[in-house]
Regions:
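NTP-dependent nucleotidyl-transfer catalytic core
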Residues: 1-273
């Protein structure tokens, strides 16, 4: 939740809520859950964007330019101004990481509240708002990596990174969107995937495995149904295979892919937030 609700959130919410309502009507015990990606690179980029916009309020845009890879939206400026209204310039000379963390802590709950408010306008409510960061804080990510290591699904590379034998487990579930290398004969070979980088930081895939392990093993759901954007189609077989790798049944995870759309006006795409 690095910004206001967009069309993908809205369409995914409607699709998931309709499916949940049908299953509920059919007699299933359904829990509606929203997964909050509040860890990883996107949140770090969110914090960096906020911090730069905050510093610009006091030093100017020329002194503190916003890189192109940062979030450029007006909502980022608005959140930075809200922070400044409370704290003034007291963070201008603080360590950049401290400033970034403070802004994330201030802005993220507001964005989540905004999502909840907007979803409520078309009568969608979730029973659980699950934070990705909790998986890291609780040690759940480390636990699932240990399970994979113990089962031989992972190994430690020469540089210290922990690698996962993805293709070995994903192949039974269909086409895998994976990185490839060319071997000596010029043919493509599937590469194993990084779960923990050489610097000790887990990848997003490690957290995803821990999250689905939490649903199926820790909380004991009989079936997990995810709503994903179609651009993540290559991740389906990987995640199902990962459930097998940790000793669960990958067929208990269903993924509904939601196609992406562009809204047009006068022949031009319309940007909606």
């Amino acid at each position: 939740p690095t910004g206001p609700m967009h069309m993908g959130n809205a369409r995914g919410g409607a699709l998931g809520d309709c499916l949940a309502a049908c299953l509920d009507w059919a007699g299933y015990d359904v829990t509606r859950e929203f997964y909050i990606n509040d860890a990883g690179n996107q949140i770090q980029k969110f914090g960096k964007s906020l911090a730069i916009r905050y510093l610009q309020l006091y030093k100017g845009e020329e002194a503190v330019p916003l890189p192109e890879e940062c979030y450029q939206g007006a909502d980022i400026i608005a959140r930075a101004k809200e922070f400044a209204e409370i704290h003034g310039d007291s963070y201008v000379d603080k360590d950049f990481e401290e400033l970034k963390d403070a802004l994330i802590a201030d802005a993220l709950p507001k964005n989540i509240a905004g999502l909840q408010r907007d979803l409520g306008k078309y009568r969608i409510t979730y029973d659980v708002w699950f934070h990705e960061s909790d998986l890291h804080k609780s040690g759940a990510v480390d636990d699932v990596i240990k399970i994979l290591m113990d089962k031989g699904a992972c190994y430690k590379a020469e540089d210290g990174a922990i690698m996962y034998r993805s293709a070995q487990y994903a192949s039974k579930y269909g086409v895998v969107n994976r990185k490839k290398d060319e071997n000596a004969d010029g043919e493509e070979e599937a590469k194993d995937e990084v779960l923990v980088r050489a610097n000790g930081i887990p990848t997003y895939f490690a957290a995803d495995i821990a999250y689905h392990y939490n649903k199926l093993a820790v909380r004991g759901f009989d079936r997990a149904i995810d709503i994903w954007g179609a651009d993540h189609h290559g991740h389906v077989a990987r995640m199902k295979g990962a459930m097998d790798a940790v000793g669960l049944d990958g067929t208990k995870l269903d993924v509904v892919l939601m196609q992406m759309v562009n809204l047009m006006r006068d022949g031009k795409p319309v940007r909606l937030l």
